[in-house]
Amino acid sequence: MKRILLTNDDGYESKGLIKLAKMLKKHFKAEITIVAPANEKSACSHSITLTKPLRFQKVKKRFYKLEDGTPADCVYLALHALYKNHLPDLIISGINKGANVGEDITYSGTCAGAMEAVLHGIPAIALSQFYQDDQKELNFKLALNITKKIVKKVFKKGFPLDKKEFLNINFPSSKTNFKGIKICKAGKRIYSYEAHSNINPRGIEYYWLAAANLDHEDEKKSDITLLKQGYATITPIMLNLTAYKQMKNLKKWMKNG
């Protein structure tokens, strides 16, 4: 029997996570385990908790929430505490509420769950559902259908990437016409950084950091452009962050002057 571990950054009650688990249980003869943050941890990136102990709270059979835990914590701790004899065959993080494209990947707790998985040598997929601001309810039907096909391929043909690489999959808004699936590169986001100040009843100033809209550089074959056109995008992500093209330039820069 295959073993699948699920996590996310929207929290253990997230609809995307619950619907994903139900779909996997229905279509795969697999042991499904969920370990997710007790609270929303969006944009927590790849942080892990080293300054205080962590505690599982059992929601039901093979379903746990982690108090104050990040997605990376959830994966890390699950592998050490729940999988002592047999590690999972696949780890899936999501389905996230909102896209994770371009440089969003570096902020994303959803993608960090997949990153933590591949650091432990386990194949991983990050799933994110793009939506438009005026959408009241997210429709995960397309995301679930595509995920089912991808998981079937993984179990039949093996994971298509090397070690320390994961699949980052984004699904288009249900308000756009679905055009198909594209394998593509991560695009380049344009952020409108904002910090809104206010004064609390005690006269102390505080700030809210504002989330940016999905603005981006115009690249025809990037995940951002294709996603907004109605494509589901699949991007292979590697953890090696070395800018190899700059190695020679950096050596010259260090020698000169």
Curated annotation (Swiss-Prot):
Entry note: cofactor: Binds 1 divalent metal cation per subunit.
Residues passing through the membrane, by range: none
Entry's EC annotation: 3.1.3.5
Subcellular compartments: Cytoplasm
Segments forming a coiled coil: none
Known catalytic reactions: a ribonucleoside 5'-phosphate + H2O = a ribonucleoside + phosphate
A GO MF label: metal ion binding
Keywords assigned: Cytoplasm, Hydrolase, Metal-binding, Nucleotide-binding
Residues holding a divalent metal cation: D9, D10, S42, N96
Superkingdom, natural source: Bacteria
Record's keyword annotation contains Nucleotide-binding: yes
Cellular component GO terms held in the UniProt record: cytoplasm
Cofactor(s) this protein requires: a divalent metal cation
Free-text function comment from the UniProt entry: Nucleotidase that shows phosphatase activity on nucleoside 5'-monophosphates.
Family (UniProt): Belongs to the SurE nucleotidase family.
Cited PANTHER family: 5'-NUCLEOTIDASE SURE, 5'_3'-NUCLEOTIDASE SURE
Name this polypeptide is given: 5'-nucleotidase SurE
Organism for this UniProt entry: Campylobacter lari (strain RM2100 / D67 / ATCC BAA-1060)
Lineage: Bacteria, Pseudomonadati, Campylobacterota, Epsilonproteobacteria, Campylobacterales
